[in-house]
């Protein structure tokens, strides 16, 4: 998984601070780690937006003004309901060798018999939760659907073992559906309206 450096600054949590930060193009955030006090920080809005909307997961190397760097993951993001801009973020520090849970984006590849028969790929999830050491977790997971038949669904328990390769494990119910090949939509035939018969008086 790629490591991205993100410069951060401490903040005071004073009244109206969040509003002031946003006018300066910054987003308030908090960083936490088990056994440590939470740290209140702010980050550049554009840099954070780029990370949040990236199609891949990243390890975030938070860079503080005193020169210290701490590895972290984005754990939660809040969006403005009107503008859809990021208005707050939670980061989690982690230590070397620490096992964490995180979401990893999913992509699909292949064109199997189900697609050849006119079926549609229906992605039922856009990310999967996995558990492992962050350095062993991929930035995205690609699932091959080239063997899937029309009407077939792949569940978490059916993801090939070589995807994780013993480096991480999937979290969630084994029966959770991930992707389906659905039947093509059949358009109903249009019927011509019959003109009412005219009667002679």
Swiss-Prot record:
Residues 190-201 have a biased composition (Acidic residues). The gene is rplY. Residues 179-201 are annotated as: Disordered. GO terms for biological process: translation. NCBIfam families: bL25_bact_ctc, PRK05618.3-2. This is Large ribosomal subunit protein bL25. Part of the 50S ribosomal subunit; part of the 5S rRNA/L5/L18/L25 subcomplex. Contacts the 5S rRNA. Binds to the 5S rRNA independently of L5 and L18. Belongs to the bacterial ribosomal protein bL25 family. CTC subfamily.
